[in-house]
Amino acid sequence: MVAHAEIKNLSFVYADENEKALQHISLSVQKGEFIALAGGSGSGKTTLLKHFKKELLPIGKRTGDTYYDGTLLENVPDLLSAQEIGMVFQNPENQLVMDTVIQELAFSLENIGLPSHIIQKRIAELISFLGFQDLLHQSVHTLSGGQKQLVNLAAVLVMQPKLLLLDEPTAQLDPIAAKEFLGLLKRINEELGITIVLSEHRLDEVIPLATRVICMNNGRIVYDGSPKTVVANMWEVEKFRPFIPQIPRLFLEWNAKDIPFTVREAQMKLNDFLAISYVSEPIVQSEKQEVILSAEHISFQYEKNNPLILRDLTVSIEKGKWVALVGKNGTGKSTLLTILAGLQKARRGKVKWNGKVIHKIDSKERFKSIGYVSQHPYYHFTFDTVWDEVYERARELYGEQGKEIAEHQLKKFWLYGLKERHPHDCSGGEQQLLALCTTLLSKPTLLLLDEPTKGLDPWKKERVGELFRKLQKEGTTIVMATHDIEFAAKYVDQCMMLFDGAVIMNDAPKEFFSGNFFYTTSINRFIRKELPYALTWEDVYEACQNDMLHS
């Protein structure tokens, strides 16, 4: 049987680079498969995905061949490629080109010359399948991140593709929107028979849906097989263990024979007579510190007649604390961070830092002492190479020592090998690290971070978490907006949930997540009855070794 898509002995090196991005890749994709691509940031996942669609082939030197339905990729007709091979990218903003949702859906169909009655029929049928009729005539600029990504997916599906490629499509979505999006992909795969190849760091949600997992490292495929086989292989190698989702990781630590991937499967394996002593874990209250940053009665809207994004919001941040702002896309987390940083002025209310109104602080002092990283790190970049980006800032701050400091900083953030690369050619995770790297050069005492772990693989995420903890011990206060609730549960001191422009929940992670039904970690959903305050596999493992399993 001819493979749906096939890659034979593919190697690739980007223009102006020496290191190979892909090395001797061979794989075949069968019709109807749901393949999850796993691996570290910069391991070659995005580069590999782009080699399935000829319009996206990166510029550089390649050897080897790619086939689509038995035809060499470069010989596949343009119209066929446009219709049958679709791709959804990480950033929802980057693919939207029209003003309204219906225009966005019609755009690609008009480009391939379909008559208007066929376009109308296709859109009507697709909208009925996806169920978002209420968004059809809305401006794309008013949509939340989750809705924008849904529109991107719909704009690809309306072409009726046979192969769907997705590059970390949930990276900027809140946990509930991400779950819905991935569930929709599974439905598309099962009900429409569309083949899916998906690169994703959120393996907790993806692995239970996938029929096959491919793990990459340094441009090579290291594991390829069923989810259970690949996870078992990853467990054997220490450096791949952080990539294993929380529930299977816990059961592997317990040396269980049959590894569950979902909450339901895991609960079926629990012992019914779990010792009651595990249930009520006391919460240790941390000492109160002085308030270093406060927002008092903040209200904000972008345009005068637009609805308020923040309404009469008041928050206090204590010195040396690490605070996570969580909540759905569009609840005002990013807006609040820019107001706290003094980059935008509230319509009403005021922000104080160290007792001073933020806008009355000298802008030079503010820029040096307050480090802000946007959720779109490429907004920070002004130079043509990674090296210049870091070196020029280091030289500005430290003069002759700048070169040595820049080298040290790049090595610390795993970016030294990319120093000659253009920042915009870096992966999403690498861009995130570069923005963080340059921001930390001035040793700010307040860090305001918008999605700092976005695009980072689990291993780098752990290292960044440890770095932030070290900065905390040195007196740095950290406020981050995040959709990564597993990361927040493991590292932060305090969680605040924004909803309808206000803070509706504010607590330490254990109390915060244990009180939630949907907005919590997979481990907490699995074992909340027995261990209400357990949020990570480490929490459960420390509480009890393996006596929770059925014998």
From Swiss-Prot:
GO terms for cellular component: ATP-binding cassette (ABC) transporter complex. Its main location: membrane. Belongs to the ABC transporter superfamily. CDD domains: ABC_cobalt_CbiO_domain1 (cd03225), ABC_cobalt_CbiO_domain2 (cd03226). One of its GO terms (molecular function) is ATP hydrolysis activity. This is Putative ABC transporter ATP-binding protein BA_3364/GBAA_3364/BAS3118. Its EC number is 7.-.-.-. It is found in: Cell membrane. Pfam families: ABC_tran (PF00005). Probably part of an ABC transporter complex. Responsible for energy coupling to the transport system. InterPro entries: AAA+_ATPase (IPR003593), ABC_transporter-like_ATP-bd (IPR003439), ABC_transporter-like_CS (IPR017871), ABC_transpr_CbiO/EcfA_su (IPR015856), ECF_ABC_transporter_ATP-bd (IPR050095), P-loop_NTPase (IPR027417). It is a peripheral membrane protein. Residues 5-243, 293-525 form the ABC transporter domain. ATP 2 binds at residues 327-334. It comes from Bacillus anthracis. ATP 1 binds at residues 39-46. Keywords: ATP-binding, Cell membrane, Membrane, Nucleotide-binding, Repeat, Translocase, Transport. It comes from the Bacteria.
